[in-house]
């Protein structure tokens, strides 16, 4: 009896396994980054592009449109999208800037069309003010309905970004120093509400207070430091709103039955005002930690389609003590949009020095840029690893993000630097791999296959190893089959397992991937598969097929084996090694499979011999009649006449192409040895 498995086991145990690298992920990534272009490439804006004569106090950028505020109460702006455009300068001293007033903050919408200028005074008796400057205007206009209100955050209408009317903002949210959230709309068109209301040239609608954030732990009003709202791409009536204060991060989720409702977002906040939903912060800091707070989002702009809603994929909130980030779920959960399985906090080192207090942070898909007094840090969100530190000689005034272009701008009083994100996920697959997040690792490895062709194989090998160690042998085998791991190394892992299903599945998958030129290995794999199937069928036969379940299991295994034999690649191999396969099947006593194989190979003579041995003469006669090979008739006529003369002669008389002269030897031999046959032969 042939036993391929035993022989191959000895062979594979004699082969040496591969050596694995001991290099850690962090060490590997750091070495690679020294050789490659940086993830965040830095460029200082040339003096020909930017020539500040006075200190720079504020800078905002959106859709390649940059606006800068200078200490001499002027604005500079330029359309970076148009290389022929020139820098515009707007003098604010005559229009909005009193002697004691200064710009508190600039707010530019993601399209770059709408700019809000918050102004405050150093004098206690002077009220704050808010001004609006459209991209097409040369002077800002005061929004009188926001007198005495110092705004600290703006939630722009992202659903308006693809609107053809660039002079309307749609509903926007306004956050204030005392924790109020207001809603208004801006319209740059002349005569917005018309003379009928006595408010010609009014730009803003009446601001409506929708909500007030509760006081902090020290019983003081909490100013709104970050504010954004989004319409769900899955539900055209569902909105989610994110609000941050110096110590808290909130989310509000609700539906708006009609998009023409004004104020639009009142229904979302109303359910929290009624108490039907309890507002509790997602994250909270002790009351002493109140110096820094910034909110940011990551949008995958590559997925943006015209006139289609693009929701952010990640949220980031920076406080003095930590950076919180989370993935945003695209589902219909009314409790949270932040994925509880994909969120974490990255703590900051607390030294007490002002130099070490983070001032601003923006997140990308996998990283965060954190601004300090005189340095910019880049860290990986997935493992907290610091990827760079950019030290600056002067004090860094601030940082801005161009959300549409995924570009970051850092500025001092007299310098501006641009940081461009480039291929930031190039090594992230290794981080996911170390965290055993194989689906994410495989997705990113596939994305970077052009510059890291080995990545996908590394991921799959590690996944296969993990599945094997967890006892998931079939899944492990199928994963190994997708790798370039040597055939010997993989089979060595599975050959000693009592259940050969995993090995069988691996061999089948391996067979699918073998090239026609690899005939020797194909033959080895096919023979091994036949042996495994035969062992499994033999074990089932020995255990019996008494119950229905046993019968079904046997039939299923046999069907799977017959399917293997019918594959063109297998059939070709068997034809070239026919006797070996017949002997193998015969050694297991599996005549059904042997006959089935002979039928597949059109090996009629072998089938005839099998049926003669089992006295199935009718089947033999049918085969002879249908085969059309008269040689087989002459060869087996003697045996048939001896065993069943009547039916044999009946069938012979129907075969027109049989030569009677060639039947005479068989007839004479039979009649001489058995005279009882004569009446059937002479008619």
Model-predicted segments: where are they?
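WD40-like beta-propeller blades
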Residues: 12, 16-365, 371, 375-400, ...
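Extended non-globular scaffold/tether segments
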Residues: 252-262, 267-587, 591-598, 604-683
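N-terminal amphipathic/basic-hydrophobic helices that include classical n-h-c signal peptides
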Residues: 1-14
